[in-house]
Amino acid sequence: MRILFSLLTLSLAMTAANAEAADCRLKPKEVVTRFMTQFYVDKKVREAFETWVDPGYVQHNPMAATGRDAAINFLEPFFATHPDIHYSIARIIADGNLVAVHSHGKFSADDRGIAVVDILRVEGCKVMEHWDVVQPVPEKTANSNGMF
């Protein structure tokens, strides 16, 4: 009986979670726009991750641990020790449930910064998976087009 009750409870919890994801009326691009604005621009790391990122979040950056809690535990102190860091989002591009965010990060006002492309996979209203590439903005360039 105890096993049956446990299975029923688990089944109801999974049904509720699936219904929540199915009820999400936001498109993946809207989910990522809200997440990245709250995270990168507003610097509300915990709030952004707890609202928009699945607990089983898969991280593909080899320098970062996987999982939502691991991301929060790394990023909160990072932003706290770098209060002048600033990100501006240049563009957000979506293809189905994959969303790419091209942004410019600067550690200070006089820093040339870094160009970042984050790729996020979204299911329902949750970011499930993340890849990124980061490139320093060079002092001199071979063209005048800029990186952003």
What are these regions (language model features)?
Residues 82-83, 110-112:
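Short loop/turn motifs at secondary-structure junctions and domain boundaries
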Residues 75, 87-92, 105, 115-121:
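Hydrophobic/aromatic beta-strand elements that line small-molecule binding cavities or substrate pockets
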Residues 101-108:
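Short beta-strand segments that buttress and anchor functional surface loops
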